[in-house]
């Protein structure tokens, strides 16, 4: 996929999935403020989600569908001329006792969390290799991959989030010589629309610091990993220390 000959990528271009709200919207706005071009994707998203600018393009669609990933990449190349980074933020999370999960539940979780990652990351890495100027791929996982919590029955969701951490480390080694970096951010409990109906006190009890993370805390970590030239294969926990053990 070659950019138009008349187009020169003056700024770096980021792709952000799950960009309509919460962490995704926060990181999209942060990149815009820092001078990046951004292609923002979500199932339901419009340009009005972000401040008026010619540096953001919007692609609506399910990232678990390969055609959506292709449209995102084509939009990045045709509009801005390059793909320099990806933030795989789109994700699904729900809990059930392990024995109650169905095949359909697993397909739903893996379709977005794993297949969605693969769909856009494969295309983006191919483009980064053509550009020969490195790149960054960051995904959002969960502190519960390393520190499960009794009573939060998220085993199948953690299969997918743990898989993201595994592929992050593998790809970091596979593409280190090409300067393409792969990292992950593992949040604890974040104040996003996903937790709108959850008890604040319960969420605070899941943090050693007794606090709920803000979206800005996760955004800062993603931006850091995107710009840290010699950091790859890392899982950066932003969870008030929850991954370290019992409290």
Predicted feature residues:
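C-terminal substrate-recognition "lid" of short-chain dehydrogenase/reductases
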Residues: 180, 214-238, 243
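Active-site loop of short-chain dehydrogenase/reductase
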Residues: 11-12, 82-84, 128-142, 177-180, ...
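Substrate-binding pocket helix/loop in short-chain dehydrogenase/reductase
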Residues: 97-98, 105-110, 203
């Amino acid at each position: 996929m070659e950019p138009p000959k008349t187009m020169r990528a003056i700024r770096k271009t980021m792709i952000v999935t799950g960009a309509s709200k919460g962490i995704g919207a926060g990181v999209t706005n942060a990149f815009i403020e820092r001078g990046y071009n951004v292609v923002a994707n979500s199932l339901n998203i419009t340009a009005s989600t972000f401040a008026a600018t010619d540096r953001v393009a919007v692609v609506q669609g399910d990232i678990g569908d390969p055609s959506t990933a292709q449209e995102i990449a084509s939009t990045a190349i045709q509009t801005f001329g390059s793909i320099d980074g990806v933030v795989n933020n789109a994700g699904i999370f729900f809990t059930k006792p392990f024995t109650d999960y169905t095949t359909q539940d697993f397909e739903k979780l893996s379709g977005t969390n794993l297949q969605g990652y693969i769909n856009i990351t494969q295309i983006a890495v191919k483009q980064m290799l053509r550009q020969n100027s490195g790149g960054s791929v960051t995904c959002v996982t969960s502190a519960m991959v390393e520190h499960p919590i009794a009573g939060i029955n998220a085993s199948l969701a953690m299969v997918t989030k743990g898989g993201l951490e595994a592929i992050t480390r593998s790809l970091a080694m596979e593409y280190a010589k090409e300067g393409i970096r792969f990292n992950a951010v593992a949040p604890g409990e974040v104040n996003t629309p996903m937790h709108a109906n959850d008890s604040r006190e319960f969420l605070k009890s899941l943090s050693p610091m007794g606090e709920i993370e803000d979206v800005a805390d996760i955004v800062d970590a993603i931006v850091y990993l995107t710009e840290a030239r010699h950091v790859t294969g890392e899982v950066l926990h932003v969870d008030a220390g929850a991954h370290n053990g019992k409290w």
